[in-house]
Amino acid sequence: MKVAISACLLGLPVRYDGGAKPVSAVQKLAEKVNVTKICPETSSGLPVPRPPAEQREGRVWLKDGSDVTEDFERGSKIALNAVTSSDITLAVLKAKSPSCGVHEIYDGTYSGKLVSGEGTLTRHLLEEGICVVTEKTIENVSPSVEHPVALILGTGLGHLADLVKPVRRIDYRDIPGFPVDASPMAGHSFEATIGTIDGVPVVVYPGRVHLYQGYSAAEVTSLVQHAHHLGCKDIIFAGATGAVSGNAKTGLGVITDQINLTGTNPLAEWAGLRDVETPFVDMNDAFSPYLRTLARGVADDLNIELNEGVFAGLLGPNFETPAEVAMLRSFGVSYVGVSTALEVIMARALEMNVLALTLAANPAGAHGTTHKSVQEASEKYANDLERLVRGVLGLL
């Protein structure tokens, strides 16, 4: 996978003060990907060292009062060309910088105060549809023994649990909030495994319960809360869905957004709020753009076809009618299923980083679809899904 990274984050002395800002998590990522080092400020010909610069009223000013807007724009376009000419889809830039800041930058008073805004290079990259994050994202998404990656698996995908080198197993009946009387459906197992996959600390949940079985939204999302209690900051959902014809096709996909059509919400139940600071959760970028970009990069490297689209969560358990499929198509929905939606809401409320992979096992509303046929289709893509998950974990 190709990634553009701010040179200062890799230890190069290109900052205004002649120093660098090396970040170990970024350097660790750089060892696993094909890196293009960029620094729009030195690319423009600005010297090192130089006075600090900040944006103010749409211009870039040095602390000595010099207007260096044109220099920053020139350097940003040079860096942009280096990124686009190499077909790079991910850039890791220095936070708060007047050239590389993402969503916040210094306000131009040289007082350390931050305001909403983008660096000069960041603006150009975003206009090109490139995923741009700062070193803070990389640090936050770095798994450890204290912060393992959670994987919650759906129908026919529980085989991923077999990849784990186990350290401990947990019966779902011992998980707070999980219904003790629940029995796993075909293709599910109710025993979590803590361990590692290729050396990456993980907690794998190879089964779940659903609303249509009569369980509450809080019970349906209890595994997410348990993962959070175990220290998980990153969570990967993988489940079978139906592909809405015209918007998606069968096979593997990554979910970019969702519509909750279940008629309920875990944050509307007292039991679902026990670990949540506020029920008023921002659902913009609910599915981490960074993790989605990693998944697409891994898929490209491994020659795995990976589609993407919006997911609609329904109550179920019946499969969709033709009229429902037509409605979902008009809504811009690509995938439809009976899990994931509530779990994503809970994960976001707990400030977890979410990646949702889907196996579109059948065309939504197709004749002859059964639970067994979904399981059989899942087996067809099992190897590619395994390679994809292992590839993503390897980049975290």
Identify the residue ranges that each predicted region occupies.
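Divalent-metal-activated hydrolytic enzyme cores
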Residues: 43, 52-78, 82, 113-141, ...
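Short, basic, glycine/proline-bearing loop/turn elements
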Residues: 8-13, 60-68, 106, 201-215, ...
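Metabolite-binding pocket within alpha/beta catalytic cores that recognizes anionic/polar moieties
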Residues: 58, 141-283
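Short, surface-exposed acidic-centric catalytic microdomains
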Residues: 21-62
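Zn-dependent metallopeptidase/amidohydrolase metal-coordination segment
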Residues: 338-374
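Short catalytic helix/loop segments, enriched in acidic residues and glycine
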Residues: 19-36, 118-122, 165-186
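Mid-sequence, gly/pro-rich, charge-dense loop/helix-turn segments that line enzyme active sites
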Residues: 99-100, 107-124, 128, 190-200, ...
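His/Asp/Glu-rich mid-to-C-terminal helical/loop segments that flank catalytic regions of hydrolases
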Residues: 364-396
